Amino acid sequence: NSWENNKNIIFSGSLIWVFLLIIVGFLNYLVV
């Protein structure tokens, strides 16, 4: 059960990083 919780935390964390990368890339696209 703890492994399932850790997997969910890692998955949600990676989703947040992907979202941040998309925002940064979009801002760079707007600036350029």
UniProtKB/Swiss-Prot annotation:
Gene3D superfamilies: Photosystem II PsbZ, reaction centre (1.10.287.740)
TM regions (residue ranges): 9-29
Subcellular location: Plastid, Chloroplast thylakoid membrane
Origin superkingdom: Eukaryota
Stretches of the chain forming a coiled coil according to its record: none
UniProt GO cellular component terms: chloroplast thylakoid membrane; photosystem II reaction center
The protein's assembly and partners: PSII is composed of 1 copy each of membrane proteins PsbA, PsbB, PsbC, PsbD, PsbE, PsbF, PsbH, PsbI, PsbJ, PsbK, PsbL, PsbM, PsbT, PsbY, PsbZ, Psb30/Ycf12, at least 3 peripheral proteins of the oxygen-evolving complex and a large number of cofactors. It forms dimeric complexes.
Protein name per Swiss-Prot or TrEMBL: Photosystem II reaction center protein Z
Species whose genome carries this gene: Euglena myxocylindracea
Taxon lineage: Eukaryota, Discoba, Euglenozoa, Euglenida, Spirocuta
